[in-house]
């Protein structure tokens, strides 16, 4: 069983293929030097909801040049996660519950960061 963040990273990379976001760096860690837009995928611990499913709170952080770029990138991520069941058989459902909001990074004051979040349900088998 893969960790839910690995599932989300994989789904977003597949979703971005052929789009303006194809070259966006999507990962669970932010590079020391940010060059271009970045999406960081983070999570709370998975919660075993049933014997065969996990429910996980997923947070998406978009780093970009300005507010609009980050909002647009997060909107693309949220759209991709709505369709994630097509990209990975482990995905059962996605529900966005927090639309993009400004989320400054205290370690990188010169970089714009926004965050959005939701819940991912995954199959264990």
Segments and roles (model prediction):
Residues 64-86:
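Mid-chain, well-packed structural core segment of small domains
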